[in-house]
Amino acid sequence: MTDTPPMVTPMPKPAEVRVLLFSASLRTDSLNTRLARLARSVLETARATVDWATMSEFDGPSYNQDLETGSGFPPGPRELHRRLEACDAFVIATPEYNASMPGHLKNAIDWVSRIRPQPFNARHGLLLSASPSMAGGNRGLWSLRMPLEHLGARVFPDMFSLAQAHKAFGENGGLADSLLAKRFEENLGAFLDLVEAAKHYPCIKKAWVEFLGEPGGEAVGRVEAA
């Protein structure tokens, strides 16, 4: 009798992950732009296709509903909407201004939130910051996280804040501290793993529930019915 090897179901090939990546700083060589460039290198070395953008591409006038009604959506917010719709996930490296996010970033989010389909909903996001301070711009990330999650974005739990960023980069553009560099790479890798899993397994999508004060029983019922 010939032994027949057991049938093995082949594992699905890794899904291509497309990531929109930009720095919310308007300065060409700001600390956050340098951190975003490093993130780009890590993501492309892994398995992601990176759509690199600059904040100036998405800039627009201060949100005004009269302007929206009279002339529609400005080119910058429409471009951000288009690029978000074309990606599986987004990564934003943002400076902290007075314990909050930059006003121009919030303005872009406010504009884009008015365009349908609303592109942040159910889209994965990772938030990064770099600052000369010991807090690394972390308070700015929390202020950014709130409106994104309100709009339904699946913001990755582990945000990355680079403290004393003016001394953190080596000559090659990487992080001089090897342990910190390892943590940064692992953070981005874990984020990609989650986005990739969400593309393969529908059950991952059911795990993301935004309660927003909703009674627990109703939220559970909504997940089970999904």
Model features per residue range: what roles?
Residues 119-122, 170-176:
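Glycine-rich NAD(P)-binding loop of Rossmann-like domains
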Residues 12-14, 118-120, 154:
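Short glycine/proline-enriched loop/turn "hinge" motifs that connect secondary-structure elements
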Residues 121-164, 179:
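Short, glycine-/small-residue-rich phosphate/pyrophosphate-handling segment
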Residues 57-58, 96, 129-132, 166:
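Acidic, glycine-rich active-site loops and adjacent beta-strand->loop/helix elements
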Residues 1-114, 179-189, 200-226:
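N-terminal beta1-alpha1-beta2 submodule of the flavodoxin-like/Rossmannoid cofactor-binding fold
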Residues 51-62, 117, 151-171:
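Mobile beta-alpha loop/short-helix "lid" or hinge segments that flank ligand
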Residues 17-25, 125-129, 173:
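Short beta-strand segments enriched in small/hydrophobic residues
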